[in-house]
Swiss-Prot record:
This is Transcription factor DIVARICATA. The lineage of its organism: Eukaryota, Viridiplantae, Streptophyta, Embryophyta, Tracheophyta. Disruption phenotype: The petals are fused at the base, forming a tube that ends in the lobes. Pfam families: Myb_DNA-binding (PF00249). The keyword DNA-binding applies. Residues 154-178 bind DNA. Its main location: nucleus.
Length: 307
């Protein structure tokens, strides 16, 4: 729910005109208290600015109204594309890197050249308009940003986590989320994304771009198999001769001295078996391809005496 008020409201407000000349600096703590108060008192709250000013010690009604106007201008500039938002790459719309750091320090986003965002990675205007419901993924990103930046820092949560939502939309979503949690189980006749309270990074990591690549072509797969098979020529091998067949086996480095030999018919547990028709003067070749071992079985139609 959008909570931005029209600009005309500020121009006609006596509070804003009377104290427009005062210039005060806002600390990080004051900004958090201010944005947290915005999440509590929406635009339909009577005497909204007086109540917001009460939540920010040392600030007057005119101060909080002017700060809100500046916030509104920032949001408008971001949506118009005048302010570059970090987190976009010129090659990939959105890239996540999960490091080994503690907490959310391992959560990084790629940056494009000069901090510019690509046109393909920019959220559509429809996604930022009023009335578009939040998705479960957006809510999880909101929880991650809430844990990193805390309550009130809606601007950083919007810029670095929920990039498809404006800071005011994040503040409004936070208001609904906290009201849902404070209800203590009441009025929960139907499920809501606001019931999701934690995000487990080990279970909910965003898939890396490598996992989203399309399946490789058969030629590419064959090239990979040929590359991997080149490492087998140095592995130890064994010869085993029986009355009617000769078997050459390759053992992996973890299983020296072992030869994997299977039934000539049916399915092998280490791979798929391809069997040809035995001819009178010919033979058939069984090939086994497994994750760790490779064996070739050749049986000839001719009989050789045992040594």
């Amino acid at each position: 729910m959008e909570i931005l008020a029209p600009s005309s409201y500020f121009s006609s407000s006596s509070w804003f005109l009377e104290e427009s000349r005062s210039t005060t600096r806002w600390t990080a703590a004051e900004n958090k208290a201010f944005e947290n108060a915005l999440a509590v008192f929406d635009e339909n709250t009577p005497n909204r600015w007086e109540r917001v000013a009460e939540r920010v010690p040392g600030k007057t009604v005119g101060d909080v109204m002017r700060q809100y106007k500046e916030l509104e201008d920032d949001v408008s500039s971001i949506e118009a594309g005048f302010v570059p938002v970090p987190g976009y790459s010129t090659s990939s719309p959105f890239t996540l890197e999960w490091g080994s750091g503690h907490g959310f320090d391992g959560f990084k986003q790629s940056y494009g050249t000069g901090g510019r965002k690509s046109s393909s990675g920019r959220p559509s205007e429809q996604e930022r308009k009023k009335g578009v419901p939040w998705t479960e993924e957006e809510h999880k990103l909101f929880l991650m940003g809430l844990k990193k930046y805390g309550k009130g820092d809606w601007r950083n949560i919007s810029r670095n986590f929920v990039i498809t939502r404006t800071p005011t939309q994040v503040a409004s979503h936070a208001q609904k989320y906290f009201i849902r949690q404070l209800s203590g189980g009441k009025d929960k006749r139907r499920a809501s994304i606001h019931d999701i309270t934690t995000v487990n990074l080990s279970d909910n990591q965003t898939p890396s771009p490598d996992n989203k690549k399309p399946p490789s072509s058969p030629d590419h797969s064959m090239a990979q198999q040929q590359t991997s098979s080149t490492s087998i020529h140095k592995l130890p091998f064994q010869w085993d001769q029986t009355s009617n067949e000769t078997i050459m086996g390759f053992a992996s480095s973890g299983h020296h001295g072992n030869m994997f030999q299977s039934n000539p018919f049916g399915m092998n547990s280490y791979g798929f078996k391809m069997q040809g028709q035995q001819m009178q003067r010919g033979g058939f070749c069984d090939t086994y391809l497994g994750s760790q071992n490779m064996a070739f079985q050749m049986q000839s139609g001719l009989h050789f005496p045992n040594a």
